């Protein structure tokens, strides 16, 4: 299909620019004390939520390509849908299909993994031990393990990264105990050697992203490969000890640990001749550890010699750098994003966020492709994120992003801009209500200032989010006790158009099923173009 756009006959956009403001983690939750957005003072958002040009969008489950409507949305699939204008099957759904059909085990890649085992090597599975279904799902690991048993693989090690973010913040034992018992039972009943070898919390070990802190990856490398870390007899002992030593400790922040035998030796360091499978399906926190396992020339930390191993990811985590080189499940093939159409039309645009969400407004927005579509038309700006836990600095870089956006707008060079405020999501993940309120109020203030500039420039702003998080900071258990909630929510997200020049040229369509994929056509309409034929329909109807 050609990348051509047709102009609307009745609406040609406004004199000024179109600005898309993505408030990461800002959903439409219950109006009660669990909702940081409701509790916070947000005069600007309050006005938007009451305006005539306001609606709500689905941002989870099947609306963003995930298997069921019980699945939380996330920033990756959210920005894919926003930028692509259509819904594509995403990581978990693709992996489910490959595992259920057995297709994954008929690939040459799986054959190469098994060859290592048949020659005496160990198969290592590294990944997030969780059913959060955001980065991974423990069911996928269980199917992989069961197939190894059926295939007679003699030695398997699991390197268990603890979640506490997309699931309960102190829920690690709900996953570690069954996994420990499963591997022990396999070893006893089948005469095989299966067990947990190492682990640690996802925010301390292995799962860094966007080059924010390579020390996290280094700690993972040392635990998984070198067998260096705090020693324990079992992973259960490790978790229980961390809890006992610090009653405030949550799973995602646990340090690296290594399981040792009766002689104090690590039971499963990765050695020459082994195979390694990183079983997370989401890419952002899988790229760096994949680089460490595959790049011969590597300088991010003192890695030492690269072991002679075969490494495969569950999926290709970066389609442009082809990282990792070998993977088990093909990613969605996303084509014809809105930015490709706008570049073809010669529309100048910018994208900006801080490090934590920079990849979302660029790579994921562009259909999982790195770099510029047309460097002569696009400007990408990354504001370095703070290297602290975000409840300690809940304002993050929102003010700096806002200031840079205003600077870019006032050059009068850009017809379209997009930005992401990370606060609602990153601070929401800490489960600190006090910090989340500050985060939300900061975003509200920044949105207000941007709307003032858009008004001055006679432009249009669209304010939305990619998924919820800060809208549900805790739940209430049966005993009436508050349980901190660090995960994303299943709530819809806001969508508001701020058009100071509005004279009734269009109205909200209010469709029965509307989600993030409807935004791209809406943006095209607001720029004066018809929607693309096979994009999900616009959220506005021209009069």
What is each residue range found by the language model?
Residues 1-543:
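Feature captures the catalytic ectodomains and active-site-proximal regions of enzymes
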């Amino acid at each position: 299909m050609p990348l051509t756009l047709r102009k609307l006959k009745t609406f040609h956009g406004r004199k000024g620019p179109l600005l898309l403001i993505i408030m990461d983690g800002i959903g439409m939750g219950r109006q009660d004390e669990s909702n940081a957005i409701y509790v916070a003072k947000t005069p600007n958002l309050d006005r938007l939520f009451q305006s005539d040009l306001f609606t709500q969008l689905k941002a989870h489950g099947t609306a963003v390509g995930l298997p069921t409507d019980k699945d939380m949305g996330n920033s990756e699939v959210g920005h894919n849908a926003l930028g692509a204008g259509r819904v594509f099957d995403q990581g978990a759904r693709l992996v489910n299909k490959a595992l259920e059909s057995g297709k994954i085990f008929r690939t040459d890649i799986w054959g190469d993994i098994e060859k290592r085992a048949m020659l005496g090597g160990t198969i290592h599975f590294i990944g997030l031990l969780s059913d959060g279904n955001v980065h991974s799902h423990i069911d996928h690991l269980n199917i992989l393990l069961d197939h190894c048993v059926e295939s007679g693989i003699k030695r398997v090690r699991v390197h268990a990264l603890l979640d506490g973010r997309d699931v309960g913040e102190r829920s690690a034992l709900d996953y570690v105990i069954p996994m420990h018992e499963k591997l022990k039972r396999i070893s006893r009943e089948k005469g095989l050697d299966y067990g947990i070898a190492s682990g640690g919390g996802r925010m301390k070990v292995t799962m860094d992203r966007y080059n924010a802190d390579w020390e996290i990856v280094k700690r993972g490398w040392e635990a998984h490969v070198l067998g260096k870390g705090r020693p324990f007899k079992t992973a259960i002992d490790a978790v229980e000890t961390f809890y006992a030593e610090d009653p405030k400790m949550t799973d995602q922040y646990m340090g690296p640990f290594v399981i040792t035998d009766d002689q104090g030796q690590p039971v499963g360091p990765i050695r020459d001749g082994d195979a390694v499978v990183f079983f997370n399906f989401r890419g952002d926190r899988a790229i760096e550890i994949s680089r460490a396992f595959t790049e011969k020339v590597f300088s991010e930390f003192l890695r030492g010699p690269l072991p002679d191993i075969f490494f495969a990811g569950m999926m290709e985590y970066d389609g442009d750098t082809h990282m990792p080189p070998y993977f088990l499940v093909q990613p969605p093939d996303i084509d014809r994003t809105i930015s490709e159409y706008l570049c073809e039309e010669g529309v100048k645009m910018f994208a900006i966020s801080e490090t934590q969400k920079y990849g979302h407004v660029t790579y994921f927005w562009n259909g999982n492709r790195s770099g510029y579509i047309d460097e002569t038309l696009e400007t990408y700006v990354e504001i370095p994120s703070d290297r602290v836990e975000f409840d300690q600095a809940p304002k993050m870089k929102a003010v700096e992003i806002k200031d840079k956006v205003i600077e870019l707008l006032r050059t009068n060079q850009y017809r379209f801009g997009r930005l992401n405020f990370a606060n609602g999501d990153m601070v929401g993940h800490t489960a600190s209500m006090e910090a989340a309120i500050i985060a939300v109020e900061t975003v509200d203030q920044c949105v207000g200032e941007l709307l003032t500039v858009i008004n001055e420039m006679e432009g249009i702003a669209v304010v939305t989010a990619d998924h919820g998080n800060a809208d549900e900071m805790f739940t209430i258990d049966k005993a009436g006790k508050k349980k901190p909630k660090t995960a994303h929510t299943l709530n819809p997200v806001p969508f508001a158009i701020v058009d100071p020049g509005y004279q009734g040229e269009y109205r909200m369509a209010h469709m029965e099923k509307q989600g993030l994929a409807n935004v791209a056509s809406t943006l095209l309409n607001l720029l004066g173009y018809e929607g693309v034929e096979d994009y999900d329909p616009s959220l506005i109807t021209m009069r």
